[in-house]
Amino acid sequence: MSKLFWAMLAFISRLPVPTRWSQGLDFEEYSRGIVTFPLIGMLLGAIGGLVFVALQSWCGIPLAALFCVLTLALLTGGFHLDGLADTCDGIFSARRRERMLEIMRDSRLGTHGGLALIFVLLAKVLVISELALRGTPMLAALAMACAAGRGVAVLLMYRHRYAREEGLGNVFIGKVTGRQTCVTLGLTAILAAILMPGMHGVAALVVTLAAIFILGQLLKRTLGGQTGDTLGAAIELGELIFLLALL
């Protein structure tokens, strides 16, 4: 399990992970690593939270929130944000399914993708600022938001099909078992109960689960399945929805 954790950390983040820590792990085994996603999200969110807490007293809440969001983007190399932009470019092109998938594969940023990035990043800065002004424990909130975003993404993997013939998302989509899904969601719920005392965190997680489940069904109907881009979009939107649900 430790090898899977380090392999997944290297896969979905830009944190330096020595190759020997995940050596001997076959790429086809990566689907089992979905259960580590909430823990990896918690780690990344905690780093972003530490940046916010460290800068808050020095430059104020809005700028601290801005640098926190920037840190989270840098930690993943914009991996999930790129998926969000590509998904919006394809979906909102209002073309045929095959053409949508072609647009999503295009490396160029379109208008809809650009607008999606602006909206999500700005919304995160504003919501983080508002939560801090309301006295929310930000280190825990940010750690849990990133854990929730990655944990609920399993809903776009279990019993879904891959919309393309090949790609990185094919490692997870349709390969995750019911047991792995339950463990992933259960671990995410446990983290919510621990990090956010009371029912506030769990309630926010339930809202996030419902929203991402609906998103997955809509994407399935539109694209005929999921892709790595839609997983990235689900993670980014999951983080934002969880933070909004905490308000």
From Swiss-Prot:
Pathway: Cofactor biosynthesis; adenosylcobalamin biosynthesis; adenosylcobalamin from cob(II)yrinate a,c-diamide: step 7/7
GO function term, MF aspect, one: cobalamin 5'-phosphate synthase activity
Keyword terms of this UniProt record: Cell inner membrane, Cell membrane, Cobalamin biosynthesis, Magnesium, Membrane, Transferase, Transmembrane, Transmembrane helix
Reactions this protein catalyses: alpha-ribazole + adenosylcob(III)inamide-GDP = adenosylcob(III)alamin + GMP + H(+); alpha-ribazole 5'-phosphate + adenosylcob(III)inamide-GDP = adenosylcob(III)alamin 5'-phosphate + GMP + H(+)
Example GO BP: cobalamin biosynthetic process
A Pfam family per the record: CobS
Family: Belongs to the CobS family.
Protein name, entry field: Adenosylcobinamide-GDP ribazoletransferase
Gene: cobS
